[in-house]
Amino acid sequence: MDLGINEISLGDTIGKATADEVRYDNKRIKPESNTRIILLNKPNGYITTVKDPLKRKTVMDLIDNNKRLFPVGRLDKDTTGLLLLTNDGELANRLMHPRNQIQRIYKVEIDKKFRAWEIKRMANKVYIGQKEWGKAEVVEQKQVKGRVTVLLRLYQGQKREVRRLMYRMKRKLFSLERIQFGPIALGKISRGRWRDLNA
């Protein structure tokens, strides 16, 4: 599928001089030299947290030498795909700040295609409950047998935003995977595996 956006390979380091840059307030976000950034392909069933009082499986269980690392944002327990972890709190805050408008690309499997008016509605805004509004751009949708694969581009990163949007749009959601964060693409890294982007 063509995302219509530039990607970088997993071997590229954030902060390296490339045409694709992550920016905040129109300034390039550049981590400190001692900053560690991990890209994890999160599997289903793992909690996105550093410690869980209920002793459930967390994303930290998947990473060796995870001292001082913490997730940049969250993915639900049942959501898979690209999750960044870092030891740089300032960098994490900049990456998550709504003003930064950093895109997230999700691949969702649903029961039926979106019609033109529904695509337009989601690109504007949809009330998703709790006095919050969600929005998403439909990059591409493709039907295979009884299911539809849709690529969605979001910028806000509200809690469970995609799931709440699908509920409001009356779509049955079969799977949800994040495949891109800013210019960083998930690529071919296996589920449950991770890569140090500073290497």
Where does each model-flagged region fall?
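Basic, flexible Lys/Arg- and Gly-enriched helix-loop patches that mediate nucleic-acid binding at interfaces
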Residues: 1-199
